[in-house]
């Protein structure tokens, strides 16, 4: 498929998702996505090089920069129908929804907190937020706020399991209140007991 065909396909899809949005923003978003697909890059310079037309490459880059920086383009509102649709379709299969939560350092002083849906050996992004921190983990309130948004997207009758590292331990109480299961990796020297009448054991002693 040529980039022109990709562009028109994305435009029609975006018109359905954000029907009330300005057509100029829809077209710019379509070019941004088309350029990403055909350049296989997220760098605006490479994306702009794939966009056809008489405009100079630098002008294309600046147009994309203005769009990305536009405060009126609310990412979550644009992506909400997509995320809700992914969760609905996955739940309709009758399988447990496996949500992967992860934090990754991006640049200097920022961390991307991302929740994805595990589906057919792929991780499909559902929702994300940025955390300003030079080092360390995201806070419990930030984690809970992100999961609370996703909780509103998940079909009420769906079974859910959340998978993540030990930094997401603050989520345990809220996940239990939603009857969501969770698997959070723990350090080997952490202690646990399987029942009230049993002794505390190191996690690494349970591995066989």
Task: Please report, for each region that a protein language model flagged, where it lies by residue.
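Short acidic/polar alpha-helix capping motifs at helix-coil junctions
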Residues: 8-14, 113, 136-140
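Local beta-strand/beta-hairpin segments that build beta-sheet-rich folds
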Residues: 124-130
């Amino acid at each position: 498929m040529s980039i022109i065909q990709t562009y028109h396909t994305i435009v029609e899809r975006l018109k359905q998702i954000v029907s009330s949005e300005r057509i100029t923003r829809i077209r710019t978003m379509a070019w941004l996505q088309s350029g990403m697909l055909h350049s296989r890059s997220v760098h605006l310079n490479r994306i702009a090089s794939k966009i056809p037309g008489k405009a100079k490459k630098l002008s294309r880059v600046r147009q994309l920069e203005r769009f990305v920086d536009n405060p009126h383009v609310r990412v979550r509102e644009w992506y909400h129908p997509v995320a809700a649709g992914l969760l609905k379709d996955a739940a309709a299969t009758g399988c447990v929804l496996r949500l992967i939560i992860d934090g990754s350092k991006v640049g200097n002083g920022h961390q991307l907190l991302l929740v994805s849906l595990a589906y057919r050996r792929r991780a499909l992004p559902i929702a994300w937020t940025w955390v300003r921190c030079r080092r360390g983990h995201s806070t419990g309130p930030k984690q809970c706020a992100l999961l609370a948004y996703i909780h509103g997207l998940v079909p009420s009758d769906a079974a859910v399991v959340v998978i993540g590292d030990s930094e997401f331990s603050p989520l345990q109480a809220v996940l239990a209140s939603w009857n969501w299961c969770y698997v959070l990796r723990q350090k080997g020297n952490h202690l646990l007991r399987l029942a009230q009448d049993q002794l505390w054991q190191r996690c690494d002693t349970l591995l066989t």
